[in-house]
Amino acid sequence: MATSTGVRVSPLRVAVASFIGTTVEFYDFLIYGTAAALVFPKLFFPQASPAAGILLSFATFGVGFIARPLGGIVFGHFGDRIGRKRMLVYSLVGMGVSTVLIGLLPSYAQIGLAAPVLLTVLRLCQGFAVGGEWGGATLMAVEHASADRRGFYGAFPQMGAPAGTASATLAFFLASQLPDAQFLAWGWRLPFLFSAVLIVIGLVIRLKLTESPEFSAVVQNSAVRRMPIVEAFRRHWRQIVLVAGAYLSQGVFAYICVAYLVSYATTAAGIDRTAALFAVFVAALVAVAAYPAFGAWSDAVGRKRLFLVGVVLMAASVFPVFALIDTGSALLFGVALVLVFGLAMAPAAGVTGALFSLAFDADVRYSGVSIGYTLSQVLGSAFAPTIAAALYAATQSSDSIAWYLVAVSAISVVAGTLLPSDRSAPEAAVVKG
């Protein structure tokens, strides 16, 4: 078991490397979701009816979520045994290779039933690798930072969500400018193949990183656990459950904003799709700027306090947001998305990395935070757009969706309140008053 022997790199460089990985994670998610709606039913499930083709296509999308907790367990186990850096390289390669291969996959017309089977296998591999990305990226950023800058640097992996959203939205918008026949023939593949560029950049940076100082200390003190996953559940089962509950609102809100609201705006509110996508792009850019600002602020005022304020703001924003969207104005739809995705989510999202990771001991931290995070995604994020669509279909009112978002926010407030605070300075001093 080796620790890093290189010269220690700056916390900023580590944070940027973490940011690139989580950007790829959300970029891959969004381009797959978009392709699942627009392209995959025709290319991989042409024998099915249009409705069945869409269902089958989104079923392959859901398969990726099923694989995430398993990825979190495996990457967490080895991340707590052989190091964070090595597992982050593996997760980035796993995500990138799977995504690029999807972009190269022959269609049903070319290789028959093997096409949807291979699509499902690649989606499983992609989800497995994603399961280990966020936890490892967050730990590298937080554990390389000094105690008084953990909130700021811990926000960089969180920035990957809006950055990936903006990148994917732009990539598919540009590809969709092709004539329909060319887009269906080869244009849809371009966003998947572009993922290779992000992967190469990320690898160049990650391979030059040193191991996390806190993991190196665990190794030097001979405190590496034989079965970190077992130790995590034995000592920190409560924190795992609380992390899952605390993240629930962020995951649900994010997936509603980027996966459901565009569909809602274009169908129920009559807003032009191009304008709706542009609004997502702008809101995502606002979030990229806001997350590190709130992360830095949390280093002064306390992470848990800012997290709870953020979740309450998210809940408070939902009824005004839907009121703005229901006007049918593209401009007000943009204002609504900036309000919820760019600003209301920022206080909680900006501090999540440091708050969640530092709730666990260093020897089982990768396992604990990865399991809590991926569990929340399966229980909340994966089904959020479907639940929202079902609620609207049953009630024909956006109020039902708003109350759903308020309910998940309430769960996160309770879980966040019970989640142990980081006791390093200055958080402990702030919490104690």
Place the predicted regions along the sequence by residue.
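Extracytoplasmic gate region of multi-pass secondary transporters
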Residues: 33, 237-286, 380-384
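Helix-to-loop junctions at the C-terminal end of transmembrane segments
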Residues: 72-83, 291-303
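Cytoplasmic membrane-interface "Motif A"-like loop-to-helix N-cap segments
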Residues: 81-93, 300-311
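C-terminal ends and interior cores of transmembrane alpha-helices
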Residues: 93-111, 313-328
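Glycine-rich segments within core transmembrane alpha-helices of 12-TM secondary carriers
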Residues: 152-173, 373-384
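Helix-loop-helix hairpin linking two adjacent transmembrane segments in secondary transporters
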Residues: 161-206
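Multi-pass alpha-helical transporter architecture, strongest
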Residues: 202-209, 407-433
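C-terminal transmembrane helical hairpin of 12-TM major facilitator-type secondary transporters
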Residues: 305-351
